[in-house]
Curated annotation (Swiss-Prot):
Pfam families: Ub-RnfH
Natural source organism: Haemophilus ducreyi (strain 35000HP / ATCC 700724)
Family, similarity comment: Belongs to the UPF0125 (RnfH) family.
Name of this protein: UPF0125 protein HD_1828
Amino acid sequence: MVSESSQIVVEIIYAYPDQYFLKKISLDQPTTIQNVILQSGILAKYTEIDLRINKVGIFSRPAKLTDYVAHGDRIEIYRPLVADPKEIRRKRAAEQAQKA
């Protein structure tokens, strides 16, 4: 007996400070995060995405490209940090100290 695969719908998002790409995609399950990304077409639109460098997650929780997705999941592709958060805090603290 052949089992029917069921369809799931997931969202994929990639954001900049002033714009974002958000797409709902329907796929057969089981499927992985990497497959969702490849099927979405996002890599053609945003050529700076490198899956060897960019981290991914599901609903703000870190995940691996090989993790399976569930119906309703939001797959997020994260951009690399442009500044070190510790350095930014140091600069803010120094600015606050100068104002005081």
